[in-house]
Amino acid sequence: MIKDERWEGVYSFEDSPYLMETLTDLRKISTENISFRKGLVRLGRYMGYELTKTMEFEKMPIQTPLEKTEGVFAKDRKNVVIITILRAAFPLMEGLIKNFESAKVGIVSASRGHAPDFKIEMNYIKVPQLNPEDTVIVSDPMIATGSTLIHVLKEFRDSKPKRMMIVGVLAAPEGINAVKKEFSDVEIFVTKIDENLNKDGYIVPGLGDAGDRAFGEPFKVPMLPQMHNLE
């Protein structure tokens, strides 16, 4: 795990050959949906393991079959809330939760519109009660403009959990700048920080639309005729 000196509390995993190989597979246009999902799960599991190294542990006495000794209790690991942004973050969350089996899970449906305004729509939020001792992990594969994450984080600003983290696959400097400007104390962990955004707000070189690549392009539901009130 590498601390990026451009920001406070921003880390990447560019020093991990395993994660870089997995990311390479995700970037390839030839990678199919199921392989893409499995790759996101692997990244989430590895990064979740690395996150445990940043958490507080307490020493505790234990009794083995042979004698008394000293063990550790991962206090913070028991107070984790993982907030998943639909839909691309599901595989990432699946990997993360393998390291935090006691974690509570929140779901947020949020989407970003197209350039130039990149309007954010949030139409579903179901998140457990947050407490001062909680570590909140927001999973979102792509930190592009940062606007979606900012909208999500604003929903929980007043809860004042112990720590707030963002875990993603790729980030653009523009997105990190935007998030850190609004939430300076939020920690960001990503597999790699890419070059920049293109005019359409996509990370380049990037990996495309993570949701579409993980689950397939969405079906275009036709607008239903307006239902009349039958009462």
UniProtKB/Swiss-Prot annotation:
NCBIfam families (UniProt xref): PRK00129.1, upp
Listed GO MF terms: GTP binding; magnesium ion binding; uracil phosphoribosyltransferase activity
Co-factor(s): Mg(2+)
Binding site for uracil: 203, 208-210
Name recorded for this polypeptide: Uracil phosphoribosyltransferase
Function: Catalyzes the conversion of uracil and 5-phospho-alpha-D-ribose 1-diphosphate (PRPP) to UMP and diphosphate.
Sites where the protein binds 5-phospho-alpha-D-ribose 1-diphosphate: 87, 112, 140-148, 209
EC nos: 2.4.2.9
HAMAP family, sorted: Upp_A
Pathway: Pyrimidine metabolism; UMP biosynthesis via salvage pathway; UMP from uracil: step 1/1
Family: Belongs to the UPRTase family.
Activity: how regulated: Allosterically activated by GTP.
Binding residues annotated for GTP, in chain numbering: 38-42
Catalysis: reaction(s): UMP + diphosphate = 5-phospho-alpha-D-ribose 1-diphosphate + uracil
UniProt keyword S-adenosyl-L-methionine, yes or no: no
Cofactor note: Binds 1 Mg(2+) ion per subunit. The magnesium is bound as Mg-PRPP.
Coiled-coil regions, chain positions: none
Gene: upp
Keywords: Allosteric enzyme, Glycosyltransferase, GTP-binding, Magnesium, Nucleotide-binding, Transferase
Top-tier EC class: transferase
Swiss-Prot/TrEMBL GO biological process terms: UMP salvage; uracil salvage
Matches recorded under SUPFAM superfamilies: PRTase-like
Keyword Zinc: no
Gene3D superfamilies, per database record: 3.40.50.2020
